[in-house]
Amino acid sequence: MAIERTISIIKPDAVGKNVIGKIYSRFEENGLKIVAAKMKQLTLKEAQEFYAVHKDRPFYAGLVEFMTGGPVMIQVLEGENAVLKNRELMGATNPSEAAEGTIRADFATSVSINAVHGSDSVENAALEIAYFFSQTEICPR
């Protein structure tokens, strides 16, 4: 199995509910190590750039507004098949469709206020990690 890295963002709704520690426990209990982390208030420019892939979608403006509405917790996760494992832990984008016990089933409110973001591929993970972290900020352990 491949050791991978992926990005995870705990969105403003989950930060506001004070569930960062509960989410971190799920990562660690499932073999994902946190090798970099920072709390950040995203600027409008950062949110627009990070989610630029969605700029032509009808939900883009609302997503950018939501992601700049409060602080986020951004972390790099490392482990075997980290991208897929994190996506399984997150659950479906729509929390009403997310499996019981997933992060979104337990902490998300709606399809647009859905607690967490995670990379969808190893390639996108590398780009997303580089967007928020320099190599010197990542501490393999």
From Swiss-Prot:
GO terms for molecular function: ATP binding; metal ion binding; nucleoside diphosphate kinase activity. The gene is ndk. It is found in: Cytoplasm. The keyword Phosphoprotein applies. Pfam families: NDK. HAMAP family: NDP_kinase. Homotetramer. InterPro entries: NDK-like_dom (IPR034907), NDK-like_dom_sf (IPR036850), Nucleoside_diP_kinase (IPR001564), Nucleoside_diP_kinase_AS (IPR023005). GO terms for biological process: CTP biosynthetic process; GTP biosynthetic process; purine nucleotide metabolic process; pyrimidine nucleotide metabolic process; UTP biosynthetic process. The active site is at 117 (pros-phosphohistidine intermediate). ATP binds at residues 11, 59, 87, 93, 104, 114. Its cofactor is Mg(2+). It comes from Neisseria meningitidis serogroup B (strain ATCC BAA-335 / MC58). Major role in the synthesis of nucleoside triphosphates other than ATP. The ATP gamma phosphate is transferred to the NDP beta phosphate via a ping-pong mechanism, using a phosphorylated active-site intermediate. Keywords: ATP-binding, Cytoplasm, Kinase, Magnesium, Metal-binding, Nucleotide metabolism, Nucleotide-binding, Phosphoprotein, Transferase. Disulfide bonds: none annotated. This is Nucleoside diphosphate kinase. It catalyses: a 2'-deoxyribonucleoside 5'-diphosphate + ATP = a 2'-deoxyribonucleoside 5'-triphosphate + ADP; a ribonucleoside 5'-diphosphate + ATP = a ribonucleoside 5'-triphosphate + ADP. Its EC number is 2.7.4.6. GO terms for cellular component: cytoplasm. Belongs to the NDK family.
